[in-house]
């Protein structure tokens, strides 16, 4: 079932019915209490928009090696430059998630894409380190596109299929690889300005035009779901989930450790390989960095599919256990080949882990998917900033990267403990629920394998 326009509610025999506005023939009526049937058109357009948003977000990771060459920036300066994008993405993710819950994904995603066009066209005039710092910060909005799309897609799919649908949507992580490869190819092959810092700036309006076209496609070819479970809720009721108990923060931390691998590595790996292992700048941007993003992206649908079918916490504990080992191997810095093995192994595992964590959000918090997704995405993006800065400080103060990667290994140890012990996942949490309504933070005392078990627990109350 597809919808080409927004819907409006009416009352029929005491039930809330949604009638599609603007339809010329065959008006569509939808029982607001029914399970959503899925919407492939919204899924795939959201996937494309998310991919483009992440491509814009990943631009400065690809530019970093060239900026070192053209402007003689230090490795620390470039690491900070690459880190401000995930920092700003973290800052805007929470409000964007709340706005998506309140106003719908179609409107918010369109406005997000339009907001990206402004700094992209202004990129033609950036000069000096601080102007690039401001530009990179504003382009960080692209990193928040996950939050909006995640809430929009999940509202169209039943809980039994949300893991798979959100895993497919999350393939948009590959946008970082698209951005890094596209930027490098445009600079080295199309614009041919590897030794000149003027012509390469055309990459900004090229991405700006693509983003503007995507905004138009999103507005005219997607619609908001009439099945949303939080209709009529105020912003205060939506954000109350942040006070609902420890569960929301545990889920957020797990996303910090899983999705944070992508934001951390995408920001730091090109510069790290260039500085520590003397990798070629073009190779670092066109091969090493995009490949790690591809590794994250390709395992997300598989992780979502497995999370639909097996106990999610057991699955996550095994993933994080292996990630701890690989993070320690990476901290040892034995050789370039060993580092690449650890990097790509972590990328594959973190993609599956992130999909499993995302699956938990609509199961535990069906009425505040946007708000909780925003918090989780903010944590994942903040991890990219925090760990990249930690790596830069480690290099500056200690002369190497070992301490920074050791800190990262400890983050994975904490995630492994949380999922193995299931601490905090056995107690119900109801503070976020408005008066007179059923609880949203679903408690399942020993098994969170499927949404059906979660719904059964809720019904039993």
Positions of predicted regions on the chain:
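C-terminal transmembrane helical hairpin of 12-TM major facilitator-type secondary transporters
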Residues: 311-357
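Conserved MFS/SLC helix-loop-helix module at the cytosolic interface between two early adjacent transmembrane helices
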Residues: 91-129
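Extracytoplasmic gate region of multi-pass secondary transporters
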Residues: 60-61, 246-297
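Juxtamembrane intracellular "pre-TM" segments in multi-pass secondary transporters
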Residues: 26-36, 225-251, 440-441
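Glycine-rich segments within core transmembrane alpha-helices of 12-TM secondary carriers
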Residues: 163-187, 377-387
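Cytoplasmic helix-loop-helix junction between adjacent transmembrane helices
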Residues: 135-172
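C-terminal membrane-cytosol helix-exit motif in multi-pass small-molecule transporters
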Residues: 188, 208-229, 415-423
């Amino acid at each position: 079932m597809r919808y080409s326009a927004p819907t409006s509610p009416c009352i029929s025999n005491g039930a809330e019915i949604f009638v599609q506005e603007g339809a010329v023939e065959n008006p569509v009526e939808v029982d607001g209490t029914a399970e959503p049937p899925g919407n492939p058109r919204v899924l795939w357009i959201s996937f494309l928009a998310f991919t483009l948003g992440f491509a814009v977000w990943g631009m400065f990771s690809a530019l970093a090696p060239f900026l070192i060459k053209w402007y003689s920036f230090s490795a620390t300066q470039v690491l900070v430059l690459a880190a401000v994008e995930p920092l700003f993405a973290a800052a805007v993710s929470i409000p964007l998630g709340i706005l998506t819950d309140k106003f719908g994904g179609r409107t918010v995603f369109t406005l997000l894409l339009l907001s990206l066009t402004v700094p992209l066209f202004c990129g033609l005039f950036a000069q000096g380190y601080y102007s690039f710092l401001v530009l990179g910060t504003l382009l960080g909005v692209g990193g928040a596109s996950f939050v909006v799309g995640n809430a929009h897609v999940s509202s169209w799919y039943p809980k039994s299929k949300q893991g798979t649908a959100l895993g497919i949507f999350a393939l948009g992580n590959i946008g970082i690889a698209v951005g890094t490869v596209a930027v490098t190819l445009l600079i080295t092959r199309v614009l041919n300005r590897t030794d000149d810092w003027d012509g390469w700036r055309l990459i900004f309006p090229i991405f700006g035009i693509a983003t503007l076209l995507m905004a138009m496609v999103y507005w005219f070819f997607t619609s908001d779901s009439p099945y949303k479970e939080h209709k009529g809720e105020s912003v205060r009721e939506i954000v109350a989930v942040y006070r609902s108990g420890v569960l929301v923060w545990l889920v957020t931390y797990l996303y910090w450790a899983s999705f944070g691998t992508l934001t951390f590595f995408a920001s730091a790996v090109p510069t790290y390989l260039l500085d520590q292992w003397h990798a070629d700048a073009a190779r670092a941007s066109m091969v090493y960095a995009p490949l790690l993003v591809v590794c994250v992206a390709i395992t997300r649908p598989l992780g979502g599919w497995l999370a639909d079918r097996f106990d999610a916490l057991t699955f996550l504990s095994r993933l994080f256990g292996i990630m701890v080992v690989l993070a320690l191997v990476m901290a040892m810095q034995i050789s370039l080949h060993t580092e690449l093995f650890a990097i790509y192994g972590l990328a594959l595992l973190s993609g599956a882990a992130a999909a499993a964590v995302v699956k938990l959000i609509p199961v535990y918090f069906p009425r505040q998917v946007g708000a909780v997704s925003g918090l989780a995405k903010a944590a994942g993006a903040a991890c990219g900033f925090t760990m990249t800065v930690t790596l830069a400080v480690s290099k500056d103060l200690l002369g190497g990267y070992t301490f920074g990667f050791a800190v990262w290994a400890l983050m994975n140890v904490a995630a492994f403990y949380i999922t193995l012990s299931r601490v905090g996942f056995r107690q119900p949490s109801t503070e976020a629920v408005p008066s007179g309504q059923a609880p949203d933070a679903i408690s399942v005392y020993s098994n969170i394998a499927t949404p059906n078990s979660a719904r059964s627990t809720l019904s039993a109350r």
